[in-house]
């Protein structure tokens, strides 16, 4: 079960439509923000900001095959990379919030209580890079989500939720047939929730497989 609130805004020539989605059931701990943006702004940077009732000098950022803790912005380090998620857990360790996303990778942390995610950017350019003054122009669709958690950061749980956001189940129609793999089939699995299988391929010069 899902409820959605649609918010429409205009800024200059740009149009913004955002759906805030609340769920019941196994996704009740997640709030989704689905966005449709027609971006037509030059010399502009669009961020979303999460001012949280949480205090910590460090946040944890996803690196794809690991994570790293980083502090607040400085004069020389004010935008950092993260892939699927970033997390701010209160210094007490009693609770925290993970921010998930499906396609945006620039983050910053201006103070102990705030996470920000960069969404779109059209930089100011000089004549040598004039072709960049329409960077990110056009239509964009993307989702970011808020997930709260009790206690400290459970990286395995956060990674699982981020993977669910990014690797959505896809359904399609097909004719009825017996198939060759049966009703269930798995190429490979892990019984350790702290181990993620990211890739599986056959070796080039043997019958072995590389994980």
Feature map (PLM): residue ranges:
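C-terminal (or distal) subdomains of carbohydrate-active enzymes
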Residues: 1-210
């Amino acid at each position: 079960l899902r409820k959605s609130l649609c918010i429409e805004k205009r800024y200059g020539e740009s149009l913004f439509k955002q759906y805030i989605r609340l769920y019941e059931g196994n996704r009740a701990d997640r709030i989704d923000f689905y966005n449709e943006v027609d971006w037509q702004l030059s010399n502009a940077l669009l961020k979303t900001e999460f001012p949280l009732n949480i205090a910590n000098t460090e946040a944890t950022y996803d690196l794809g095959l690991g994570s790293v803790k980083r502090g607040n912005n400085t004069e020389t380090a004010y935008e950092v990379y993260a892939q699927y998620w970033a997390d701010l857990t209160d210094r007490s360790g009693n609770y925290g919030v993970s921010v998930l996303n499906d396609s945006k990778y620039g983050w910053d942390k201006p103070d102990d209580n705030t996470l920000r995610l960069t969404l779109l950017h059209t930089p100011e350019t000089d004549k040598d890079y004039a072709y960049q003054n329409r960077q990110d122009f056009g239509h964009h669709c993307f989702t970011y989500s808020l997930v709260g958690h009790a206690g400290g950061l459970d990286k395995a749980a956060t990674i699982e939720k981020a993977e669910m956001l990014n690797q959505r189940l896809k359904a399609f129609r097909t004719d009825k047939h017996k198939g060759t793999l049966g009703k269930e089939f798995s190429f490979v699995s892990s019984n350790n929730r702290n181990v993620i299988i990211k890739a599986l391929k056959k070796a080039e010069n043997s019958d072995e497989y590389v994980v």
